Amino acid sequence: MTATTTLKSFNYLSLINHRLNHNSYAILSSPLLPRSHPASTSFSNSGFRFFQSNHLFSSQSGSLMEVFKAAFSEASNSCDRIAIKADGKSYSYGQLTSSALRISKLFLKDDTTNGGQETKKYEGFGSLKGARIGIVAKPSAEFVAGVLGTWFSGGVAVPLALSYPEAELLHVMNDSDISLLLSTEDHSETMKTIAAKSGARFHLIPPVVNSTSETVACNQFQDDSFEAEGKFLDDPALIVYTSGTTGKPKGVVHTHNSINSQVRMLTEAWEYTSADHFLHCLPLHHVHGLFNALFAPLYARSLVEFLPKFSVSGIWRRWRESYPVNDEKTNDSITVFTGVPTMYTRLIQGYEAMDKEMQDSSAFAARKLRLMMSGSSALPRPVMHQWESITGHRLLERYGMTEFVMAMSNPLRGARNAGTVGKPLPGVEAKIKEDENDANGVGEICVKSPSLFKEYWNLPEVTKESFTEDGYFKTGDAGRVDEDGYYVILGRNSADIMKVGGYKLSALEIESTLLEHPTVAECCVLGLTDNDYGEAVTAIIIAESAAKKRREDESKPVITLEELCGWAKDKLAPYKLPTRLLIWESLPRNAMGKVNKKELKKSLENQE
C-alpha cells in the first residue's frame, strides 16, 4: 500500500486542517524543510509503521513577535503586564519591547568597538538581515531584550553559554560567523577579548528599566518602528548549537516560522495562559530553556521568573513562598515548573534532608502548582514515582530535540504513562523506521513537524542526509510504540543501544531498573568493547550517601557486582545484567544534565 500526499503552501502558519481516517495521513505544509526536499512526495509503508496525532494543531492568530508589537497598541492590555522577574525586579512587556527597539536602533550607529582590531563589517538597521548576532547574558530581561532587538533588526540570534570555555565560544562564534557580540556589563571584559579574537564587534546590552522605575507610554512608537527588513517568516531567526553528545556540535537554524509554530503548539498542548507564572532555572542556549520555559510562555503572555542558577533550597523556598501552609495564595505564586531529571533527583535529595515540618510545608506547596514537566533526558521510573509520592505530581514527560524542539508529549489531561514520552503533538507526524532484523517493532524514530529546523549551518550535505526521501527528519533515536500508542525512547542509536552477544539492548532500560536499587543514587550504563560478546554491559554507579556511609562503617564495599546482579536477576533478562561495575563519586554531565556517553566510552576504552 502506498499513501500519497501533497504539501500545500501556507501563509503565516495557516495550517492545513482536515480529518484523519484509517487510510490517510495529514502532512503539514512546511517551507522549513531544506530546499532539496520536493514539495510533493510519495512514500511507502514498507518497513515502516505510521503514527500520527488524533487531531491537528489549530493555529491561533498572531506570532511571538506580534505579542511584543501589541504591547505598544493603545488598546493593548499587555503593555504594563509583567513579562519577566529577575533579581527581585519586574519588567513589563512594554519595557522589554522598548529596550529591544533601543537595541535595534543601536545597530544604526557605528559606535561599537572590538578593541581596535579589524572587524567583520555590517551596516546597521535593515542590512542586518541574516547577520548572526551572538548573545551572552545570564537569564535576565537583558537576554530577552537582546534576542528581540536582534529580530527587530532582521538579524539571527545565536545564544551562547556562559559556561562555555573560551575555545568553545570561539569555535561557535567562528563557525556561525558572528559579526556582533552582545553582552552585559558583568561579562563585558571577557566578551570584549573574545570578540576581538573572533573579529566580531562588541556592544553592551543596555540595562532594561524595571516596572517600578519607568512607565512606558504604550502608544509612543509608530508601527513602522517594527518594519525593519528581515522579519520574513522563512528567514533564519535563531541558531542553537547541539550539545554534541553524539558528535561535534552543529548549528541548528530555526526560522520565524518554526519558532511561531512551536510556541503555538506548546501553548495549546499544555494550556499556557496569561495566568501562568513560570519558575525558570534552565540554560538559555538549549531549546528546553528557550522554547518550553521562555518563548512559549511569553507568547501566552505568562510571567517568567528567572532564578540565576539551579538551587535546590531556592526552588523549594520559592514554592513555599507561593503557597504558605495557611492556604493563602500569594499574588505572584508559581504555577508551572519544568526541569531535567537530574534536577528532580536533587530536589528529592533536598526534600529528604529537611526536618518533618519543612517537608510538610514543602510538599503542601508543591502540590499546588498547576503543572510540572521533565525532559532533555530520560526520566527514571523511580524518580517519577518518588516525586509523585512527595508532591502528588506525575511529571509530564515529552520528547524533543534541537532540530524540531518538541514533537511528542504525554497528555496534560489523561494518562501519563511512565517510561514513555506520549504521542505526537497536534500537527506533528512520526513514524518508526523498523530494523528488518528486529521482531519487536524497534527502529529509528522519524519526525515531520511545522517546527522543523531549516538546515544545519554551513552543512548542506549533513542536512540532506538527515532527512528521508519523503521529508521526515531522522532523529537517530531508537524507539518503539507501546500498546497504547505511546512512544518509548530506547536511546541514541550511537550511544544508548548496545550490541551484546547478538542482542540489541537499551542502556536506558537497564539504567532505569538499576536506579530502583536502594544503594544507587545515579547510574550510567554503556557498552564497552568485548572480544567475546561484542560489547559488555558496564554500569557506573554513584551511591546514595546514607547507604555509602553505612557500608563504609561496616568496612564493606558500597556494592559489589555480584550483589547488584543478584538483586537485578528477577528484573532483567540474564543477557541484560551488567558484567562490569564501576563506583564513582559523580558523573560528568553537561548543562542539561546529560552524560556524553560517546566521549565517556572512548575515555574508558583508552584506559584499558
Curated annotation (Swiss-Prot):
Main location: cytoplasm
Gene3D superfamilies, alphabetized: 3.30.300.30, N-terminal domain of ligase-like
Family annotation (Pfam families): AMP-binding (PF00501), AMP-binding_C (PF13193)
pH profile: Optimum pH is 6.5-8.0.
GO cellular component: cytosol; mitochondrion; nucleus
GO MF annotation, one: malonyl-CoA synthetase activity
Tissue: Expressed in flowers.
Classification via InterPro entries: AMP-bd_C, AMP-bd_C_sf, AMP-binding_CS, AMP-dep_synth/lig_dom, ANL_N_sf
Reactions catalysed, as given in the entry: malonate + ATP + CoA = malonyl-CoA + AMP + diphosphate
Listed EC numbers: 6.2.1.76
UniProt subcellular location: Cytoplasm; Nucleus
Protein's GO biological process: fatty acid biosynthetic process; malonate catabolic process
Highest taxon listed in the record's lineage: Eukaryota
Record's keyword annotation contains Lipoprotein: no
Family according to the record: Belongs to the ATP-dependent AMP-binding enzyme family.
Note: Plants overexpressing AAE13 show increased sensitivity to exogenous malonate.
Protein's recorded name: Malonate--CoA ligase
Lineage: Eukaryota, Viridiplantae, Streptophyta, Embryophyta, Tracheophyta
